[in-house]
Amino acid sequence: MKITPINNEKTFKDNVLLVTKTDLKGKITYANRAFMKIVDMNEDILVGAPHNIIRHPDMPGIIFKYLWTYLQSGQEIHAYVKNICSDGSYYWVIANVTPSFDNTSATSTKIIGYHSSRRLPTQGALAVIKPLYEKLLRAEKSGGIAASEKIMTELLNDKGVSYDEFILSF
């Protein structure tokens, strides 16, 4: 399903939590009603679909590289994400994505899927994130993901923080 983006931002109340769960390959296994409402897609469309069905083309690939690196190493991650709705509108979230572990034993480290909870980001955070993502996307278009990774690495090194610490600093 290819969705053409339009310049129309959707928003939701700051007490709303958008939730999805995916399998190891990123296919949606669960979406809560709030998530289905904002993207304007029902379970028949979402369940079994790749989570990137809602990926907005304005999102830099480096953010997803960080996401998968953290998750596959068993760590949670936070990220600001611009997603696309079925009509091409977009919405911003601050996402907390965690690996889901096999719970057959208290010490299991086997990842069986992923859980994402998203909230409405603050305008202050977006004032920093939007221009950063635009810069990263421009770098990726001219020099690939390595170019945006270089920008992020320099930014994080200059601030002396990890990616997650940077994201949580807003």
Give short role names for the model-derived ranges.
Residues 2-136:
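Sensory/regulatory domains in signal-transduction proteins
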Residues 111-170:
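Juxtadomain coupling helices with adjacent low-complexity linkers
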